[in-house]
């Protein structure tokens, strides 16, 4: 096969998302908000989804003002199939067909396994694993019919390692990683890529308990080869890459943004 080097695009243009429409669950705070902002900065119109309408609308207004893109807020419980169907209809009215789906809504309930309730388990699994499945099931086939799509699931370093006191969370994130791989295989031939971002420790609301405990915070730092927690902006580049044409040959992969933790 002869290589046509003259056909290569400007590499920076590959990262532009002009004309694309993205939906980010849990986009009102934490890593989801950072990802939503990055996609908008790259030219995408964005739908911010959370359970609380006031939260997602406030975030949407802030991001629209700072990025000069169309950003809307839509309330939905993405762990409920009826809400996901309603969400799909609503975002199509507001923005059009979704090209980029980011499943970043997350929940963590910490505690020893024998101390956790069944409802604790169900809540974490529903938010972290069931919701990406439901959203993928609705939006993925629509992307396939149009021949282009990007799905990014938020995994974790706990997709591949374990820590005490995190049975529901680690189980859900391990599931997310294999869900990502299965969907990638099912839709690879139809122009839709499915990948996971697996972050290490970041300063988000989910980690307030650790951030407020100096000993626990430093214990995590000691496990990270770069010697610090992640900063929120450091997730943005990973998301933009996987959402763009630059990653058209990347699917079924997990991108670890963890300061080297899982390299050990």
Protein language model regions, located:
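Conserved glycine-rich cofactor-binding loop
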Residues: 21, 28-29
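Substrate-binding pocket helix/loop in short-chain dehydrogenase/reductase
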Residues: 112-113, 117-125, 151, 220
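Active-site helix of classical SDR
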Residues: 136, 172, 180
């Amino acid at each position: 096969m002869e290589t046509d080097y003259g056909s290569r695009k400007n590499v920076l243009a590959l990262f532009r998302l002009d004309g694309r429409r993205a939906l980010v669950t849990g986009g009102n705070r934490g890593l989801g908000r950072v990802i939503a902002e990055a996609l908008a900065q790259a030219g995408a119109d964005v739908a911010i989804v959370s359970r609380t309408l006031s939260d997602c609308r406030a975030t949407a207004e802030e991001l629209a003002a700072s990025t000069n893109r169309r950003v809307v807020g839509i309330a939905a419980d993405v762990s409920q199939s009826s809400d996901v169907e309603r969400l799909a209809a609503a975002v199509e009215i507001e923005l059009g067909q979704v090209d980029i789906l980011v499943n970043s809504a997350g929940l963590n309930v910490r505690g020893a396994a024998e101390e956790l309730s069944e409802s604790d388990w169900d809540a974490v699994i529903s938010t972290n694993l069931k919701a990406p499945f439901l959203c993928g099931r609705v939006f993925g086939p629509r992307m396939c019919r149009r021949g282009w799509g990007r799905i990014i699931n938020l995994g974790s370093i706990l997709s591949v390692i374990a820590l005490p006191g995190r049975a529901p969370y680690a189980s859900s994130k391990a599931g997310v990683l294999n869900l990502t791989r299965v969907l990638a295989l099912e839709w690879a031939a139809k122009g839709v890529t499915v990948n996971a971002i697996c972050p290490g420790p970041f300063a988000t609301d989910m980690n307030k308990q650790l951030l407020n405990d100096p000993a626990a915070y430093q214990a995590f730092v000691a496990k990270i080869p770069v010697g610090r927690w992640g900063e929120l902006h450091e997730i943005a580049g990973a998301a933009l890459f996987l959402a763009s044409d630059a990653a058209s040959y990347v699917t079924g992969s997990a991108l670890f943004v963890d300061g080297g933790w899982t390299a050990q």
